[in-house]
Amino acid sequence: MEKRVICCIGDSLTEGDYGVYGVTGVANVHEKNYPYFLAKELKCETRNYGRCGLRADQYLDYYMENNLDMSDADIVMIMLGTNGGHSVTEDTVPNESYKKLIKVIQKDAPKAKVILVTPPHVTANPEFANHWYRTHVEVSVEFVRNVAEQEDVYLIDAAKYEEFNEETVKIYQKNDGLHYVEEGYQEMARFFSRKIKEFFPEMFG
């Protein structure tokens, strides 16, 4: 039986940035990211199409310019919003780009199931360098939930995952309070794999 293919769209939390202690805006990308661990959890092939620092509008440009191969994808996961730009009260360019990205992917990967993922926990603790991301991540979470309902696509609400919280930030997000480290990405993949098995038992029975 051929391995299932999961394409992972996103920003630094997909690409696998661990962050740097006490510093903001410096990439520290590692191989052991959530797609790496998800492949092991589900015994599938994952393709990591994450790009650090991108909002939805910037990611749409990147997607269109790079001809990312989606043709044989069984599942496409989209986890964007950490870098802001979204609003639930007015139309913004990132809002429109996020919705357009879904449509483009549905066209490019006709057999794929699309899963939207809310950005996961960001600390509010000012001791961590990237705590300030929390404000726009909260808006993005609400935006993604709304889009999943409007577009009738699957949603993994990572923001509600109870294992990621203000207590465990010192374990899973210990460098900057935003990016995860190896243990965090592994736990994220475990959570995602459980949800994917619930959604698609016929694929991962």
Regions found by a protein language model. Give the residues of each.
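Conserved beta-strand segments of the P-loop GTPase G domain that flank and frequently precede/overlap
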Residues: I78-M79, I115-T118
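Short hydrophobic segments within beta-strands
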Residues: I9-G10, V117
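A short helix->loop->beta-strand "cap" motif at the edges of active sites that frequently abuts
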Residues: D108-K113
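Conserved SGNH/GDSL esterase-like catalytic core that processes O-acyl groups on lipids
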Residues: E2-C7, E15-K99, E138
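Catalytic His-Asp segment of secreted/periplasmic serine-dependent ester chemistry enzymes
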Residues: C7, P120-G205
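Hydrophobic positions in alpha-helices of CheY-like receiver
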Residues: L101-I105
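Short, flexible active-site-adjacent loop segments at beta-strand->alpha-helix junctions, enriched
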Residues: S12, T82, P120-T123
